[in-house]
């Protein structure tokens, strides 16, 4: 598998990941937060997390569009979207509510993954 194939596969995987994350946030926020290592959320934390569902559905749609069309502007849009997520999970990891061992490190890795995807999708846009 070459770099382009790996990036295209990653893009397809992210469609499912973002749909799952958005669906979990919308329909089962406590369970989804628990899967991420979060303590039992307060009602306001549940609603704040639930309001992120449209964001992740938008990410899934952008990934799906790039998978279907593959135009340079689609890849640039994904690079930009993933770039906006570089620090969000790192900032979120500072919450004391992430109690499960490894959950904070996983959020830092999510930031690194977003950086890698942003760079990779930008590369695809220029290819």
Mark where each language-model region is.
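Short amphipathic, positively biased membrane-proximal segments
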Residues: 1-127
């Amino acid at each position: 598998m070459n770099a382009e194939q790996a990036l295209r596969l990653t893009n397809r995987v992210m469609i499912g990941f973002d749909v799952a994350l958005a669906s979990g946030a919308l329909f089962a926020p406590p369970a989804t937060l628990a899967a991420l290592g979060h303590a039992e959320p307060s009602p306001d934390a549940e609603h704040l997390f639930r309001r992120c569902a449209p964001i992740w559905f938008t990410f899934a749609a952008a990934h799906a569009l790039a998978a279907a069309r593959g135009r340079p502007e689609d890849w640039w849009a994904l690079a930009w979207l993933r770039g906006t997520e570089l620090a969000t999970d790192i900032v979120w990891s500072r919450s004391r509510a992430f109690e499960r061992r490894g959950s904070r490190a996983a959020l830092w890795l999510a930031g690194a993954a977003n950086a890698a995807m942003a760079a990779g999708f930008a590369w695809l846009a220029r290819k």
